Amino acid sequence: MSTAPSKAEEIIAVLRSEILRGQYRPGERLPSERDLAARFGSNRGAIREAIKKLEQLGIVAVAPGGVRVLPVEEATLEVLGYLLE
């Protein structure tokens, strides 16, 4: 029996897809937590969880001033496999 994906997992799937399609380019900042929460109809905790996972995968970097998209070349093959699921 499968369970429905969590809100954070849904956000991860959408953001990684948008990054791979070039909607967010390397070096570009993602929208603020507040803006993402409004867009996805979720709380900021789910946004933080999604961003943390994307950072662990090497897709984005969190720094003062916001979350920036990393170049795809920096991602490992394992990450690329995850992205293409």
Report each predicted region and the residues it spans.
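Short linear motifs at protein or domain termini
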Residues: M1-E85
